[in-house]
Amino acid sequence: MKCLLLALGLALACAAQAIIVTQTMKGLDIQKVAGTWYSLAMAASDISLLDAQSAPLRVYVEELKPTPEGDLEILLQKWENGECAQKKIIAEKTKIPAVFKIDALNENKVLVLDTDYKKYLLFCMENSAEPEQSLACQCLVRTPEVDDEALEKFDKALKALPMHIRLSFNPTQLEEQCHV
């Protein structure tokens, strides 16, 4: 009985720890993700990360630019103080090709889950720091059109993650997301 209680206690302690994305893309070619992208869908572990137009992780990716050093420059737009602001984030390469380190938007990692390079890219931003662990993911597409295949892959990837809010955008919204 003592062993059962100990095992149960350990299981609960481990389950309450970090929100961890375990599946990232193998063999990411960072040069192939370069170019214009549109945020088709977003999801987050905490409703407050996306619920309002100016929510902390409600960002609209505009362009991905690999740097000569192998890092990834992310150009995005975000609502701040009632207007659209352009931001640039440098995601530093790590030993894992699909994982990047960032120090922006209160997040500390960008993880590429999947991409076909031509139509869609799925990624998550993770903050594993205590006590405010959080996870926000996006489905990016190359054109301002709804891509059902990309959305299916996004929904499949989210099944294993603790998401509590999900937003998706129609073609008009994709065109008008947040223009500077």
From Swiss-Prot:
GO molecular function: retinol binding
InterPro entries attached to this UniProt entry: Blactoglobulin, Calycin, Lipocalin, Lipocalin_CS, Lipocln_cytosolic_FA-bd_dom
GO cellular component, one term: extracellular region
Compartmental location: Secreted
The entry's keywords: Disulfide bond, Milk protein, Retinol-binding, Secreted, Signal, Transport
Database matches in Pfam families: Lipocalin (PF00061)
Known tissue expression: Synthesized in mammary gland and secreted in milk.
UniProt cross-references to PROSITE patterns, sorted A to Z: LIPOCALIN (PS00213)
Signal peptide residues on this chain, from the entry's feature table: 1-18
Superkingdom assignment: Eukaryota
PTM section of the record: Alternate disulfide bonds occur in equal amounts.
Disulfide linkage: 84-178, 124-137, 124-139
Function: Primary component of whey, it binds retinol and is probably involved in the transport of that molecule.
Assembly, per entry: Under physiological conditions beta-lactoglobulin exists as an equilibrium mixture of monomeric and dimeric forms. Interaction with LMBR1L is controversial.
Family according to the record: Belongs to the calycin superfamily. Lipocalin family.
Name listed for the protein in its UniProt record: Beta-lactoglobulin
Species of origin: Bubalus bubalis
